[in-house]
Amino acid sequence: MRKTKIVVPIMLTELAELEKVSVSDYRTADIVEWRADFLSADEILEMAPKFFEKFKESKILFTLRTVREGGNIQVSEKKYLQILKEILTYNPAYIDVEFFTHGPSFAALKDFRDKMVLSYHNFDEVPSDLTNRLIKMHEEGTAFVKVAVMPERECDVLDLLQITRDMTLEYGDHFISMAMGDLGRLSRISGYLTGSCWTFASLENSSAPGQISLKETEYILDILEK
Amino acid sequence: MRKTKIVVPIMLTELAELEKVSVSDYRTADIVEWRADFLSADEILEMAPKFFEKFKESKILFTLRTVREGGNIQVSEKKYLQILKEILTYNPAYIDVEFFTHGPSFAALKDFRDKMVLSYHNFDEVPSDLTNRLIKMHEEGTAFVKVAVMPERECDVLDLLQITRDMTLEYGDHFISMAMGDLGRLSRISGYLTGSCWTFASLENSSAPGQISLKETEYILDILEK
């Protein structure tokens, strides 16, 4: 059994697209991430029942990636919370909550911590306070803590691997980390060493810079995690 | 062009085997390593002219890996030096010299430093003095400095990646490092980050624990070094 779980995002830009999606394409994904932020708020709530019905055999991670954290949707705090609350009624395996951008929503959803992937994305750099941010997020007691950062130099990637390892040794196996871009690719396949629990792999178009395809990720992890 | 060069070892155990070797199997290897230590000293010297003729289109690394450094041949210092001297007459691209095990031979061959892969192998651990050993080896001014060590824990591998990166930044692009065993596999494909110049990949049977096949290594490096 593979140590690092593979999450495959699905990014639908129109309601009609859901029908064309072939669930079997996602059959080897450990988790399907519905990156809902390619739709409007109303479209998300309209699509939700059909999406969760269609993927009822899959573990679903619901993610509303906002513009400030590199995503596509711009919503008020109120609307962000409202969408997450409604999605929770469909009982997804996990929901992503942007800790530093949507603190109030996180506070309002604390009862669902066992479903939460508390996330932080930095598309500019690997911030020097990353360790403190990770500890802060860890202390909230969510299922997972996820960080995605942008390395500027090789050492940034190596530092992230080391930080993830230290966090895992210190606080346990619930961290997910990735360095984005071409430089960061190694971080997407090094979970067996660092303890990073998940890796995000694309079916076709990637949902973040430096992402590797599902097929390639499976091939590489099967070699590294022999 | 691939940043990390792929070295493929060839380990012949009998004189008659050379004829059966298909040179085209090695055509995508950047360097062919003749791991001669699977033969006796006399067999090596007898095979040499045919080997160098057969692989005249390839860059050849000649390696006599002694028992003390994880290899198969046990020879006196005198015999070790005699073999290397004779092999040098065939003008291989590189020769491996075990720095800490065969210091006198290294001293006697200093004129060939531009062909030398100065090597150190530790099959037990990642020694705490690894950085000092690397600096000491670097100071000898050889073409490459190669270390292969055995990690006991995940942090050992991450430390090796960091040390290799630091060495490369400090002293330039002539280090080759690998952590052996299953744990160390990531180090065999992370040259684009650490600066490790070569990786050793097997055609079929691996010549060191944790080695990845040539085909797999090419596939992975083409993804990571995009």
Curated annotation (Swiss-Prot), chains A, B:
SUPFAM superfamilies recorded: Aldolase (SSF51569)
Function: Involved in the third step of the chorismate pathway, which leads to the biosynthesis of aromatic amino acids. Catalyzes the cis-dehydration of 3-dehydroquinate (DHQ) and introduces the first double bond of the aromatic ring to yield 3-dehydroshikimate.
EC number(s) recorded for this UniProt protein: 4.2.1.10
Highest taxon, organism lineage: Bacteria
Protein family (similarity comment): Belongs to the type-I 3-dehydroquinase family.
UniProt protein name: 3-dehydroquinate dehydratase
Key words of the record: Amino-acid biosynthesis, Aromatic amino acid biosynthesis, Lyase, Schiff base
HAMAP family cross-referenced by the UniProt entry: AroD (MF_00214)
GO terms of molecular function: 3-dehydroquinate dehydratase activity
Residues at the catalytic site: H121, K146
GO biological process, one term: 3,4-dihydroxybenzoate biosynthetic process
